Amino acid sequence: QCFYKGINFTNYYARTNKINPLKCENDYYTMPGVCYNTKGEEYTTLVAKEMGFDAEKYDGETMIRLRANGGDISALKKQAMEELSAIGVTFPVKATYFIIASSTSALDNATILKQCFSDSFGDDFIKLDIQTYVSSLTQEVRTPQLQSFVINGWSADFGDPVNFLGQETLHDDNAFYSHYYSNIARVAEAPADYQKDLMDAFEQYTDLVNAANAIVNDTDARYEAFAKAEAYMLENVLVSPTYYDIAWSLTHANEYSKINAMYGPCNYKAVNWETSEEAYTTVQYEQFAKAFDAAIQG
């Protein structure tokens, strides 16, 4: 709860998007645009509705998930420290985060992230401990299970929420993230007493995902069920979404005129692009964005 409701990532986002940092805010686990129901509603808007975020819009000032409490997690922090102290945890907790040793950019990003932890949590609660690996995150970090957390992501392989949500379930050898990132699948084999509530939450989440995945004759009901499962995952912070990765370029092509498929090979086709002899400006792109948003809203 402290992670999801307390960390202000704005300065960290600015490392990716200096002009509009909060355009990088990610409050959901499934990427936008993967699928739509028969009413034309994009799937993550269903998750937003389940979480009470459906009325919240980008304002360029405050992260959506920090608006309800203004980022104030003092009560949650106090509760967490009391509960963790009761099982022998000492503070500050060290959150170990690995970056590749050869990248100065990765170090700069991690340094900003460390400051976000400090500003949001206070140095008496959780401190980011930046560590490095030489060449292989898998061999040097994931396999020996040295990480406290990993910031990672991927694009859709196919157009259905199970593509994402199935990665975090229990009792499934194909749940890649459960087995190789959070390692929760291994915890499930022999949980300690203090992990009971966490495992109960993962079991409930797994049941919700499996129930949604069993709905194969009603697309709208399937997506509604997955949205409830995803909202449960996020409200219980079984994972904490961080940011949308974007690429910067000085371009003579209007990105809003390109094919924007969420999966498959279509994006590699250079057809029907709108182009300009002069590189587009920020002002022009703001106009493109407004026109695009108006078009998709009908």
Please describe what each predicted stretch is.
Residues 1-48, 59, 64-72, 109, ...:
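Periplasmic-binding protein-like
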Residues 56-156, 247, 298:
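Ligand/substrate-recognition segments at binding pockets and active sites
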Residues 35-71, 85-89, 139-145, 166-209, ...:
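Short, solvent-exposed loop/beta-turn-alpha elements that line the ligand-binding surface or hinge
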Residues 6, 64-71, 103-111, 196-203, ...:
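Soluble non-cytosolic domains of exported or imported proteins
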Residues 11-14, 135-172, 233:
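Pocket-flanking alpha-helical
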Residues 17, 118-122, 142, 155, ...:
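Hydrophobic alpha-helix feature that most strongly marks membrane-spanning transmembrane helices
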Residues 9-12, 19-23, 34-37, 101-105, ...:
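Solvent-exposed loop/turn segments at secondary-structure junctions
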Residues 13-17, 74-101, 197-253:
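Bilobed periplasmic-binding protein-like "clamshell/Venus-flytrap" ligand-binding domains
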